[in-house]
């Protein structure tokens, strides 16, 4: 599902532990790391997509997490021209994302990246809250900065 402006609706997931660290996932067979994210299907709300993607990409269920916050609006990034599939219709030029800040309630050993036939990640680790800004692929950096900045106060006041 692509919107009229060419952006694919998507959810981004920032999963935190009790130490305030975030789950940082390695893309399968690559030296690229990112937060879990995924598209919103036509019949889904952003929250529905969040739980589906959380299970598909990280192996966690609804009961394993608590939603602490969500970004107020859509955050957009454009794909670099080399990644735009110019022969597909409708043309997708980027993603528009709702970002969710989650707290892990269960044991971290429940995190599994191999539950689907086509896993997106093959490793993960806990990193400091702001660490991803210096590590994520350049074209996603501004969206990460905006999401982390907007959601940070909720992490700091969660108790």
Swiss-Prot record:
PANTHER family: M7GPPPN-MRNA HYDROLASE (PTHR23114:SF17). This is RNA pyrophosphohydrolase. GO terms for cellular component: cytoplasm. Residues 6-149 form the Nudix hydrolase domain. Signal peptide: none annotated. Pfam families: NUDIX. The keyword Secreted does not apply. The lineage of its organism: Bacteria, Pseudomonadati, Pseudomonadota, Gammaproteobacteria, Pseudomonadales. Its cofactor is a divalent metal cation. HAMAP family: Nudix_RppH. Accelerates the degradation of transcripts by removing pyrophosphate from the 5'-end of triphosphorylated RNA, leading to a more labile monophosphorylated state that can stimulate subsequent ribonuclease cleavage. GO terms for biological process: mRNA catabolic process. InterPro entries: Nudix_hydrolase (IPR020476), NUDIX_hydrolase-like_dom_sf (IPR015797), NUDIX_hydrolase_CS (IPR020084), NUDIX_hydrolase_dom (IPR000086), RppH (IPR022927). A motif (Nudix box) lies at residues 38-59. Keywords: Hydrolase. Coiled coil: none annotated. Its EC number is 3.6.1.-. Gene3D superfamilies: Nucleoside Triphosphate Pyrophosphohydrolase. GO terms for molecular function: mRNA 5'-diphosphatase activity. Belongs to the Nudix hydrolase family. RppH subfamily. It comes from Pseudomonas putida (strain ATCC 700007 / DSM 6899 / JCM 31910 / BCRC 17059 / LMG 24140 / F1).
């Amino acid at each position: 599902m692509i919107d009229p402006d060419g952006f694919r609706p998507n959810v981004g997931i920032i999963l935190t532990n009790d130490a305030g660290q975030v789950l940082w996932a390695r893309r399968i067979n690559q030296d690229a790391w990112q937060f879990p994210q995924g598209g919103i299907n036509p019949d889904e709300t952003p929250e529905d997509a969040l739980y589906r993607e959380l299970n598909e990409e990280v192996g966690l269920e609804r009961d394993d997490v608590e939603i602490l916050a969500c970004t107020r609006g859509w955050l957009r990034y454009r794909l670099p021209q080399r990644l735009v599939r110019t022969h597909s219709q409708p043309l997708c030029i980027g993603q528009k994302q709702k970002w969710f800040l989650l707290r892990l309630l269960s044991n971290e050993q429940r995190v599994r990246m191999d539950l689907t036939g086509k896993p997106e990640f093959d490793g993960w680790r806990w990193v400091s809250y702001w660490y991803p800004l210096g590590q994520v692929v350049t074209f996603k950096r501004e969206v990460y900065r905006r999401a982390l900045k907007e959601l940070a106060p909720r992490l700091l006041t969660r108790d």
